[in-house]
């Protein structure tokens, strides 16, 4: 509106700059037409049905991506305006390469660190939070997708016990207690480090992985470890406190719980090895959990230190 209707050239310049910055960020989040990655506020429907996120419509108008959910006034005004996003955003938004696009950003007055890594076959994004170590909010801090929307994966601490309750944060979205996420390329560690009093006051005493395991071609679940394959992409997920399948039939196929709120999760994605090679390599790599870090001797990256804060 300011870009089109303002009579002040300086204000128009600010408006264009704000739009350019927004669409540059969208281009990093865009994966097959879906806006992924860490978000300041996420709702259950955004996470469970990523093709219907309302903001996907901006990608549709800007780059011709496939999803145009029921829209509202702002995207309509954008579509009718003369504004065109920077040409440099198209390649990033429609990234179609096996070589990863890797970009890190520090944003806002709190210096929030965001990481985006994606190829044509997968997306891996994360964010820090000013609330780390404290009661949480609806922030979505880790987002992974392999293939299409059925291959979406994230880890969080439920903010309430009611699966489809009304609290914020909820069961699927945000964190009741906020972890620290440390990402290195296509790997990350998620640290939950909370005092006994914080743990006792939490409504839910476990963290969980949300993943539609039946959407993957192969899976191996053993104790602390989960191995997955979808196409040529492999995933290794490890929770220090173990992985448990919930008793509820409704949740058993797409949720794994890890008890306690002093816990470390580790996630590694790879598309360079066969599934059997990947399983063998990750079973033999050293994963050492310490109070202030997680040390992993990765078969490809070498020794990686993931700091817990």
Can you say where each PLM-predicted feature lies in the sequence?
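Extracellular polysaccharide-recognition and catalytic grooves
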Residues: 1-105, 110
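Ser/Thr/Asn(+Pro)-rich, low-complexity disordered segments
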Residues: 62-309
């Amino acid at each position: 509106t300011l870009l089109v209707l303002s009579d002040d050239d300086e204000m128009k310049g600010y408006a264009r700059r704000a739009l350019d910055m927004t669409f540059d960020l969208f281009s990093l989040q865009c994966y097959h037409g879906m806006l992924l990655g860490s978000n300041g506020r996420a709702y259950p429907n955004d996470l469970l049905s990523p093709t219907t996120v309302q903001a996907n419509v901006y990608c549709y108008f800007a780059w011709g991506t496939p999803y145009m959910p029921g829209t509202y006034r702002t995207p309509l005004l954008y579509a009718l305006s003369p504004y065109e996003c920077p040409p440099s955003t198209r390649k990033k938004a429609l990234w179609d390469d096996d070589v990863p696009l890797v970009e890190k950003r520090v944003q806002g007055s709190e210096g929030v660190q965001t990481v985006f890594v994606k190829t044509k076959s997968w997306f891996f994004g994360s964010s820090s939070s000013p609330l780390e170590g404290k009661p949480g909010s609806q922030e979505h801090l880790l987002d992974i997708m392999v293939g299409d929307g059925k291959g979406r994966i994230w880890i969080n601490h439920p903010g309430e016990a009611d699966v489809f309750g009304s609290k914020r944060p909820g069961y699927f979205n945000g964190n009741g207690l906020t972890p620290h996420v440390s990402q290195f390329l296509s790997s990350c560690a998620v640290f939950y480090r909370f005092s006994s009093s914080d743990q006792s006051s939490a409504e839910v005493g476990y963290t969980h992985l949300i993943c539609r395991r039946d959407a993957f071609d192969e899976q191996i679940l053993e104790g602390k470890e989960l191995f997955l394959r979808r196409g040529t992409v492999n995933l290794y997920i490890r929770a220090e406190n173990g992985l448990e399948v919930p008793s509820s039939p409704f949740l058993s196929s797409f949720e794994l719980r890890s008890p306690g709120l002093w816990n470390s999760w580790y996630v590694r994605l790879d598309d360079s090895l066969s599934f059997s090679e990947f399983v063998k390599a990750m079973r033999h790599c050293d994963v050492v959990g310490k109070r202030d870090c997680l040390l992993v001797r990765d078969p490809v990256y070498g020794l990686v230190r993931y700091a817990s804060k």
